[in-house]
Amino acid sequence: MFKHETVLLHETVDMLEVKPDGIYVDATLGGAGHSEYLLNKLNEKGHLFAFDQDQTAIDNAKIKLADYSDKVTFIKANFRDMKEALNERGIEAVDGILYDLGVSSPQLDERERGFSYHQDAALDMRMDQEQELTAKTVVNEWSYQDLIRIFFQYGEEKFSKQIAREIERRREVKPIETTGELVDIIKTAIPAPARRKGGHPGKRTFQAIRIAVNDELGAVEDSLEKALTLIKPGGRISVITFHSLEDRITKQLFQEATKGPDLPPGLPVIPDEYKPDFKLATRKPIVPSEEELEQNNRARSAKLRVIEKIIK
């Protein structure tokens, strides 16, 4: 069964200031924890559109949320296509959107999906099982330079060159097929003193390959830009990020949206059309409480940022 500890559950939904008759979007359905809590706040006029590109997540959510079936629409799609999918269903604007950008724990834990460096499986890492590009293709066919780039940019891996060189050496002998083989390559490439500190040596490389396979950062940027155009005045967008790359994209997009155009200083009155359309709901990101961290270690790096469209 799809088990997933929902991070910042109450904070993420409560910060949306849910209207009982509003229209909401869960851009990252996953284990459906946020969706369930949000649906609980809606009356018979309210509705939730829940997106996931993983059919397993949708199938499990249909069971978990069976009591709310008249209030929720499930959409199997990448959240970068959210606006188009909503428009097709006659929805032009919504009251709130939430994102939980953590990979669902079940996906990490399902051996055959190939996300985990703890279990040996085929190199896959696709969120959408119907897409062609897999981790095996990245590892075996991408150039030495491209591997260095993704390991460094997406994994912030100090030993990117050493790992890419070892991959190149091994794949010349035979294709690299499994996560276990990749872990072995990473352990060979990273110097012993560095291997012994800072968690599993494969963590950064696996993250980098997963982001590349699923174009996660491109999807986040596309989706958030569209989300800003979907939100009604007074509506909010909540975004939970788990690593600095996604957080940087979210922070920059939100800062850009809350800035008005450059005006000469000293104007006595600023016309409405020159005022920004958005404001940050909190000055600093919200982070999990000590209590939550004790119960769920995966929440440690979570940050919640919230933006609101100003009513003019």
UniProtKB/Swiss-Prot annotation:
Gene3D superfamilies: Putative methyltransferase TM0872, insert domain, Vaccinia Virus protein VP39
Main location as per UniProt: cytoplasm
One record GO biological process: rRNA base methylation
GO cellular component, one term: cytoplasm
Membrane is among the record's keywords: no
Localization terms from the record: Cytoplasm
EC numbers: 2.1.1.199
Domain of life according to the entry: Bacteria
InterPro entries: RsmH, SAM-dep_MeTrfase_MraW_recog, SAM-dependent_MTases_sf
Binding residue positions for S-adenosyl-L-methionine: A32, G33, H34, D52, F79, D100, Q107
One GO MF term: rRNA (cytosine-N4-)-methyltransferase activity
One Pfam family named in its UniProt record: Methyltransf_5
Swiss-Prot/TrEMBL keywords: Cytoplasm, Methyltransferase, rRNA processing, S-adenosyl-L-methionine, Transferase
Catalytic reaction equation(s): cytidine(1402) in 16S rRNA + S-adenosyl-L-methionine = N(4)-methylcytidine(1402) in 16S rRNA + S-adenosyl-L-homocysteine + H(+)
Family from the record: Belongs to the methyltransferase superfamily. RsmH family.
Protein purpose: Specifically methylates the N4 position of cytidine in position 1402 (C1402) of 16S rRNA.
Record-given protein name: Ribosomal RNA small subunit methyltransferase H
Organism: Listeria monocytogenes serovar 1/2a (strain ATCC BAA-679 / EGD-e)
Lineage: Bacteria, Bacillati, Bacillota, Bacilli, Bacillales
